Amino acid sequence: MKVSIFSNNGLSSQKVATALQKGLTAAGVPIDSLDPDVVVTVGGDGTLLSAFHHYNDRLDKVRFVGIHTGHLGFYTDWRDYEVQELIDSLAQDNGQSVSYPLLTIQVEYADGTHPDQALALNESTIKKVSGTMVADVYIKDELFESFRGDGLCISTPTGSTAYNKSVGGAVLNPRFNAVQMAEIASINNLVFRTLGSPLIIPADEWIRIEPADPTDNVLMCDQLGIEGRPIKAIMYRIARQRIAFAEYRHTHFWQRVESSFIGRENA
């Protein structure tokens, strides 16, 4: 089994990455950043998101595991003082894993050029550079609503605890193979109406968003921007691919939610 170490540039993360590399070498575990079986990220959830996009053409072959060197994250199960325990688990790896849904994003451009596709681990957002975004929202090719507001957020179950939650979306257990759409500051009055609540879309349905103005839109895939050509439409659905994590220890999803947003000391 080959391991890649993917670290952020923080001093504490670099120290952990160096200790991890030395420990894996001593344990006889090969280090290979080009063709790994397991990618170990050192940092936080942002570092793991970066690693996911770096290796998203190898999702059928690679598993991820995260060491967090800052605050507790949803994707990082190991603390910086548990490096040796993780090395022992990697050395005894037998392929154990857990997988989570991903989001497929297909972008059609107003100039008729070839559509782009991307994968998101957390979410995708569409907003205007400035002013109100106006867009028609279709569910399974049926017009659902005409949206006016700051933007829309479409998230995966694991991404439901990220930006989606901050704009009023529901927290969704990742065992649900579904995507969620949450409105960002929608305009609701006697003239303009939207549903005004999050939507949960099953795996056999899809969301299509058609901006009224194809120009000056900002489309994000996790923390990455998608090329800023005039957009005709964006289609979202559950991806065929899934992300796999090496499951050396199990942390219940709701335990992650509680520890990140509530805290036992407040109980």
From Swiss-Prot:
Organism: Levilactobacillus brevis (strain ATCC 367 / BCRC 12310 / CIP 105137 / JCM 1170 / LMG 11437 / NCIMB 947 / NCTC 947) (Lactobacillus brevis)
Function: Involved in the regulation of the intracellular balance of NAD and NADP, and is a key enzyme in the biosynthesis of NADP. Catalyzes specifically the phosphorylation on 2'-hydroxyl of the adenosine moiety of NAD to yield NADP.
Catalytic activity entry: NAD(+) + ATP = ADP + NADP(+) + H(+)
Taxonomic superkingdom: Bacteria
Enzyme class: transferase
Keyword Metal-binding recorded: no
Family statement: Belongs to the NAD kinase family.
Keywords: ATP-binding, Cytoplasm, Kinase, NAD, NADP, Nucleotide-binding, Transferase
Entry protein name: NAD kinase
Protein residues bound to NAD(+): 45-46, 122-123, 148, 150, 161-166, 185, 223
Active site positions, chain numbering: 45 (proton acceptor)
Pfam families (alphabetical): NAD_kinase, NAD_kinase_C
Keyword Ion transport on entry: no
Chief site of localization: cytoplasm
Needed cofactors: a divalent metal cation
